[in-house]
Amino acid sequence: KWGSIATRGHRDELIPHIGTSNGSRNPRRNYLIDLPPRFPAEFPRDFDSKNYTEKDNTRLAYNAYLKKFLRCVRGIDDNLARLFKHLEETGQMDNTIIIYTGDQGFMLGEHDFQDKRWMYEESQRMPLLVRYPKSIKPGTVIDSCVENVDFGPTMLDMAGLKVPASMQGKSFKKHLETGKEPEGWKQTAYYRYWMHMVHHDNPAHVGIRTKTHKLIYFYGCNYDGGYQTPPGWELYDLSTDPHETINLYDDPNHAELVADLKRQLAETRKRVGDDGSHYPAAEKVVQEFWDYDLKDRQKAQMISREFLKRREAELKAGKRNIRTHQGFQEASYPE
């Protein structure tokens, strides 16, 4: 099934506490709590969630958010139209490199999650359109692994400027001009989310994506190694399961693939300078659960139970905004 102990708990006990929900699934972070006071006009007059079913509440909260989201998108589109009109009227349209992208994707209810900060497809993948008819053939589609660190080098390259050696990314100008992936181009994309359980109850995680598979490691702690959630691994076959509904990490048929992706992930972390040396307390947790043997899994189960107790105590005390990204909390996990 989808997810892991990191996103569901040992026996699904953490489903109410991981990730912002549309309806009331997550009692700390959900749009049914947050949106009615902010946008009362998007809900029925004198709205009280107690008078509606969970299904209706979820629908109302989801639609309220989606309307706001799409209005933002429409605002961007309208202003892009103004810009393009100006470029056309001044004769600069075909002499201008237009790059349309975003800093990340966005969850709009998939897995009952909202916002970004996940390595799942809807959040990790970004829109990327490039127009420059002088050298890019209209309708060109490339399927190369491109990351946001590649944007800067590409812009400099297209402007005829030298790309500094200090920049991590590589120019994909040749991809755009030829429609083909150059030999030796990277075959993976790297992902890291570190603000553990801060804005939308997202556990800290790191991972790697190829064109066909994705490996996610939820190490589940802040930079001080504290506020732990259960560590867990997830593997998805994007060619057969594009919506990431079946975690294949424990499937024996994928053991060799898991080992290879872990090797690539470790190498990538070193290559990009995210090897954990700057935050040794967090890296200690990362390494502790890297192999994920029986002992690791048993400890993850205990962490899941301990986190549930902590979260329930916080909710009972009326604490919604907990300082999760810093500090270390002592735990009672036996060695």
Enumerate the language-model features and the residues they cover.
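Short amphipathic alpha-helical coiled-coil/interface segments
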Residues: L261-L265
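C-terminal cap/loop subdomain of S1 sulfatases and analogous C-terminal strand-loop tails that border
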Residues: Q104-E110, V149-G152, D157-E234, L238, ...
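Charge-rich, acidic-biased intrinsically disordered regions
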Residues: I99, A282-R297
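Short beta-strand segments enriched in hydrophobic/aromatic residues
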Residues: G102, Y132, Y219, P280-A281
